[in-house]
Amino acid sequence: MAEALSERYRNRIHRALSRPNLLMGADRELVLITGLAAVILIFVVLTVYSALFGVVVWIVIVGLLRMMAKSDPLMRQVYVRHISYKPYYKATTSPWRRY
């Protein structure tokens, strides 16, 4: 019995496999989507003002997304799951309360 316990295998779990997928400190997909929207705004309007506005809006949104990821890196996935389950789990004070 003692021999079986001493011969345990150790498997390393790499940190990259358990970390959330972030880009610039925010959710990767949301940063890329907002960057795409800013680039589309810049190249569709093609003025200096639209370029400045697009860059400023993107920087502000990335800042907000970083604050969101700092509080909970998986907040987007949790919110999407919350929206999908909303019809099934009504917001009540008790699960046994009648509607």
From Swiss-Prot:
Q: Where in the cell is it found?
A: Cell membrane
Q: What residue intervals traverse the membrane?
A: 21-41, 42-62
- Give GO cellular component annotations, separated by semicolons: plasma membrane
User: Where does the UniProt annotation place the signal sequence?
Assistant: none
Keywords of the record, alphabetical order, are: Cell membrane, Conjugation, Membrane, Plasmid, Transmembrane, Transmembrane helix
**Major site of localization recorded for this protein:** membrane
Say which family it is in.
Answer: Belongs to the TrbD family.
NCBIfam families attached to this UniProt entry? PRK13823.1
The name this protein goes by in its record: Probable conjugal transfer protein TrbD
What species is given as this protein's source? Sinorhizobium fredii (strain NBRC 101917 / NGR234)
